[in-house]
Amino acid sequence: MSRIGKSPVTIPEGVTVDHKDGVVTVKGKLGELKQEIRDIDVKIEDNVITFERSSEKSDQKAKHGLYRALVNNMIEGVTNGYTKSLELVGVGYRATNQGNKLDLAVGYSHNIVLDLAPEVKVETISEKGKNPIVKVTSHDKQLVGQVAAKIRSFRAPEPYKGKGIKFVGEQLRRKAGKSA
């Protein structure tokens, strides 16, 4: 049995979980998330969700822990939310946000304007003498990671000087320059 899949998920106060027609819906103070679940039996009793598989097929074994982790992430998201922070390292690199648009100046001849989904909130922090920071926040963990990866892809950090957009706390593999 899957080590992750066999452990139950507790439902905190203020969160409602519903399972109908193979779709689990989680509602909380930060929003609502849905996940389609196939081949795994979901049981909701006394604020505890358990996941059981009907057979020992390899695809069901693989999905057992996956669906448990996805539902747990959904509950965590509608309760506390998720945040990823990116740091813009480079001279003249700037980030500003106007509503649901993020404007990045990262060394190209033009600014990059990124339209964001309504579920995603972006905050830009610019202090004098420090690198600008972009914080991506949402109740959907997958969406936060996807938007943060897209922002990072506009100017991934290069290994020689370390310039580019990197996650806060990310360790870059640096290379030595050519020797004289």
Swiss-Prot record:
Gene3D superfamilies assigned to the protein according to its UniProt record, in alphabetical order: Ribosomal protein L6, alpha-beta domain
Keyword flag Ribonucleoprotein: yes
A GO BP entry: cytoplasmic translation
Pfam families named among the record's database cross-references: Ribosomal_L6 (PF00347)
Gene Ontology molecular function: rRNA binding; structural constituent of ribosome
Keyword Ribosomal protein: yes
GO cellular component, one term: cytosolic large ribosomal subunit
Key words, A-Z: Ribonucleoprotein, Ribosomal protein, RNA-binding, rRNA-binding
Quaternary structure, from the entry: Part of the 50S ribosomal subunit.
Family, similarity comment: Belongs to the universal ribosomal protein uL6 family.
Biological role: This protein binds to the 23S rRNA, and is important in its secondary structure. It is located near the subunit interface in the base of the L7/L12 stalk, and near the tRNA binding site of the peptidyltransferase center.
NCBIfam families: L6_bact
Record's protein name: Large ribosomal subunit protein uL6
Organism lineage: Bacteria, Pseudomonadati, Bacteroidota, Flavobacteriia, Flavobacteriales
The gene coding this protein: rplF
